[in-house]
C-alpha cells in the first residue's frame, strides 16, 4: 500500500466508516473506493475531492491527502522537485514584495569583543559567526569569505543580509557546495537554490558558488568531526556537522593552510553558474550560442515580446524609446529568428498580464527598452497576441501561482537554465545554470505545470484578452479630444 492509500484507510476508520457504508452514504462508486484504500488503483482528483468532502475532514487533513495523492500520481521524486521549485518562487515573491534582496538594518550592535574561541551551543556558535563576519566586513577594504557550509543552510545568508547594508561594502564569497549524485535526491540539489538565488540577487554580495558530486548523505554528517568551515583573511571558523559548536582560529599558519587547501578543492569542483550584474554584458551572455536552440521553455510575468509584436514593431519601439540599444538589434534580430523557429512553451502569470493591460508595464527585454506601453500600443500588442495565441504553447498561470514580477526564467534544450532578475536598467542579475540535476528538475517541473491546477483554461484566457482590448479601446475613446 502507498502512503496515500494508507492515509485514506486511516481517515475512513477514524470517521467511523468502512468502504460499503461510505459509498452508500456519499454515493461514491464502491469499486473505485475499495481500490483507492487498498492501493490497487489511483482514482481521479475529483473522486478524491468527493472522498474528503464526504468525510468532512479538516483543511489540514485535506491538504495532506491531496499532497499524498499528487505524490502518488507523479512520483515522489517529481513531487519533491515540484514542491521545492514552487517554494523557491514563493520565497522570491516575498523578497520582491519586501522591496529588495537587501534591507537596511535598524540596529547597530557596536563593537563586538571575543571572550572565548570555542562555542558549545547554537547560540554561542551564532555569536562566533557574527563576530567573524562583522570583523571581516569592518576591517577589510575588500572583504572575502570562503566556505563549504551546506548549500541549504540559512545561517550565513541571514547574517550577511543583516550586516552588508550597515557598511556599504561589497563582499566576495566563494562557496563550495556538495551535490547529490543520486537522481532520487535531486531535490536536495534544488533546495540549495533557496539560498543561492537570493544571494546572487543581493546588492553588495559577489557570490560565486562551486559544486562537486558526492554520495555523502545528510545521515552521514553526525559521524564527521567539524566538517564545515568559514575562512576569512584573519579567521578560520570550524563548525560541527549540525552547526551547534564552533572553534575559531586566528593563527596565520592555520589560515594559510586552510586557504591553500580551499583553493585546491575549487580546482576539483565546477562553477555552478555564470552570472553578470551588468546590463550590456548580460545581453551578450543571453544571446550566446542561440543558434543551437531547438527547444525553449520560458516563465515570465507577461507573455514573450515576440508574442506581443512582430520584430519590426519591436525594433521601431526600441529606436523610439531606447536608441542606445540600437547596436544590439542586429544580433537580437538573428536571435529572435531562431527563437521563432524553435519548439516553444511559454508560461506567464495572470497578475503580470493584468498589470501590463492596466498600466502598460511589461517584463523581460521589453521592460528594459520600452519604459511603458501606451493604451494604443497595448491594444496593438493584445490583438497580435490573441491572433497568434496557441493553447499548446501559451499558458496563463492563475492567481494561486506565486511568482515575482521581476524574474524571467528560460530553459534551453533542457540543459541550460537562465534566471534573470530585472528590477530596472540599473538593477539586473543574470544567471546561467547548466548543472544536469537542476536543469532536469526544471524540465520536468514545466511538463507537470502545463497540465496542473495552476493553468487558466484557454477559453477564459481568450475572454480576458478580449475584455482588456475592449476596455483599452474605451479608454482611448474617452481621452481622445
Language-model features, listed with the residues they occupy:
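Conserved hydrophobic/aromatic packing and binding residues within compact polymer-binding modules
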Residues: 8, 22-23, 33-36
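Hydrophobic protein-protein interaction segments
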Residues: 114-475
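A short, Lys/Arg-rich alpha-helix, primarily the initiator
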Residues: 1-21
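Short amphipathic recognition helices of helix-turn-helix/homeodomain-type DNA-binding modules
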Residues: 1, 47-49, 53-105
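Residues in the helix-turn-helix
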Residues: 21, 32, 61-64
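Alpha-helical residues within the helix-turn-helix
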Residues: 13, 24, 53
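Recognition helix of helix-turn-helix/homeodomain-like DNA-binding domains
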Residues: 27-43, 50-53, 67-68
Amino acid at each position: 500500500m502507498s502512503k496515500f492509500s494508507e492515509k485514506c484507510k486511516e481517515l475512513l476508520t477514524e470517521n467511523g466508516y468502512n468502504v460499503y457504508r461510505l459509498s452508500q452514504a456519499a454515493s461514491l462508486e464502491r469499486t473505485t473506493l475499495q481500490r483507492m484504500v487498498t492501493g490497487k488503483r489511483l482514482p481521479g482528483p475529483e473522486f478524491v475531492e468527493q472522498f474528503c468532502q464526504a468525510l468532512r475532514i479538516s483543511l489540514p487533513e485535506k491538504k495532506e491527502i491531496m499532497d499524498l495523492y499528487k505524490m502518488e500520481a507523479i512520483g515522489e521524486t517529481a513531487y519533491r522537485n515540484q514542491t521545492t521549485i514552487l517554494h523557491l518562487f514563493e520565497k522570491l515573491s516575498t523578497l520582491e514584495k519586501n522591496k529588495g534582496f537587501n534591507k537596511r538594518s535598524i540596529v547597530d550592535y557596536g563593537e563586538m569583543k571575543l571572550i572565548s574561541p570555542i562555542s558549545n551551543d547554537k547560540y554561542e556558535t551564532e555569536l562566533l559567526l557574527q563576530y567573524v563576519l562583522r570583523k571581516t566586513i569592518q576591517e577589510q577594504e575588500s572583504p572575502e569569505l570562503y566556505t563549504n557550509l551546506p548549500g541549504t543552510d540559512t545561517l550565513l545568508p541571514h547574517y550577511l543580509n543583516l550586516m552588508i547594508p550597515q557598511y556599504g561594502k561589497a563582499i566576495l564569497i566563494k562557496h563550495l557546495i556538495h551535490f547529490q549524485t543520486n537522481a532520487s535526491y535531486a531535490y536536495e540539489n534544488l533546495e540549495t537554490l533557496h539560498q543561492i538565488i537570493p544571494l546572487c540577487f543581493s546588492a553588495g554580495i559577489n557570490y560565486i558558488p562551486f559544486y562537486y558530486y558526492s554520495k555523502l548523505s545528510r545521515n552521514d554528517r553526525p559521524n564527521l568531526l567539524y566538517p564545515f568551515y568559514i575562512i576569512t583573511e584573519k579567521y578560520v571558523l570550524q563548525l560541527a556537522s549540525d552547526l551547534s559548536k564552533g572553534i575559531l582560529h586566528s593563527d596565520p599558519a592555520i589560515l594559510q593552510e586552510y586557504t591553500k587547501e580551499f583553493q585546491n578543492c575549487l580546482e576539483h569542483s565546477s562553477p555552478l553558474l555564470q552570472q553578470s550584474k551588468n546590463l550590456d554584458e548580460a545581453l551578450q551572455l543571453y544571446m550566446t550560442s542561440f543558434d543551437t536552440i531547438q527547444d525553449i521553455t520560458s516563465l515570465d510575468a507577461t507573455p514573450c515580446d515576440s508574442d506581443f509584436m512582430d520584430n519590426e514593431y519591436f525594433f521601431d519601439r526600441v529606436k523610439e524609446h531606447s536608441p542606445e540599444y540600437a547596436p544590439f538589434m542586429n544580433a537580437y534580430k538573428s536571435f529572435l529568428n531562431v527563437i521563432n523557429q524553435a519548439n516553444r512553451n511559454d508560461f506567464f502569470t495572470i497578475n503580470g498580464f493584468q498589470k501590463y493591460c492596466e498600466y502598460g508595464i511589461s517584463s523581460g527585454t521589453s521592460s528594459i527598452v520600452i519604459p511603458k506601453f501606451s493604451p494604443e500600443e497595448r491594444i496593438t500588442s493584445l490583438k497580435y497576441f490573441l491572433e497568434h495565441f496557441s493553447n499548446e504553447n501559451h499558458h496563463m498561470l492563475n492567481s494561486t501561482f506565486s511568482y515575482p514580477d521581476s524574474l524571467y526564467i528560460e530553459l534551453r534544450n533542457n540543459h541550460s537554465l537562465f534566471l534573470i532578475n530585472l528590477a530596472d536598467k540599473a538593477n539586473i542579475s543574470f544567471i546561467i545554470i547548466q548543472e544536469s540535476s537542476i536543469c532536469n528538475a526544471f524540465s520536468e517541473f514545466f511538463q507537470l505545470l502545463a497540465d496542473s491546477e495552476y493553468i487558466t483554461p484557454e477559453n477564459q484566457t481568450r475572454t480576458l484578452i478580449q475584455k482588456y482590448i475592449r476596455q483599452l479601446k474605451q479608454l482611448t475613446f474617452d481621452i481622445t479630444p
